[in-house]
Amino acid sequence: MDSINQKILLDLPDGIELFIKREDKLHPIISGNKFRKLKYNIQEAKRLGHTTLLTFGGAFSNHILAVAGAGAEFGFKTIGIIRGEELENKIAENPTLAKAQELGMQFHFVSRTAYRDKEEKMFVNHLHELFGNFYMIPEGGTNELAIKGCEEILTDTDKVYFTHVACAVGTGGTISGLINSSGQNQQIIGFSSLKGAFLSDVIRNFVVKTNWNINDSYHFGGYGKVNDELIQFLN
């Protein structure tokens, strides 16, 4: 399945064209890179005989909502481990969690301190004690299978026509897929949601090409943060 390349009409220097790839049109809920990241994970969960998907995220996580949507569409029970306990009794006040719950997701709220240990064996074992057997998808959805899905974002035409491909970077999965599938003469540019060089190290675990770079000048303090400069740009 391919998305649509929509031309953006801006006053740009001669010879430069800007397009946005409408990955959000792939699915009404499992949209954008989430569709790509979950595609092969869903297939693997089915192959292994799992009936439950478990994943992690914050209260406004698009990934949480996408997994809930995938579960509803493909017949999986879904469990979301949510960072922070402040909304445990106020789910209806949060549109992301409310929609995920409507789609059948069960929530388990944990403190931010406990959440930092989410990938530790002891923490995962405790989750198995609570919820039994499940197929675990990491926070943000990034793993080898997710990257395989993201390698399908660029079509053969895209790899020839576009000289530069830019995307937002959170956990590094989407840009890793773009890098792996990029054309010989393409440059891949990632704009990080977070400050720090750690993302480049994460990406290097998944790619061998060097036609990419990460720009962290526009993180504006990280997820969920805004300042006057960002508000002015949006307006």
Where are each of the predicted segments found?
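PLP-dependent amino-acid enzyme catalytic core
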Residues: 1-235
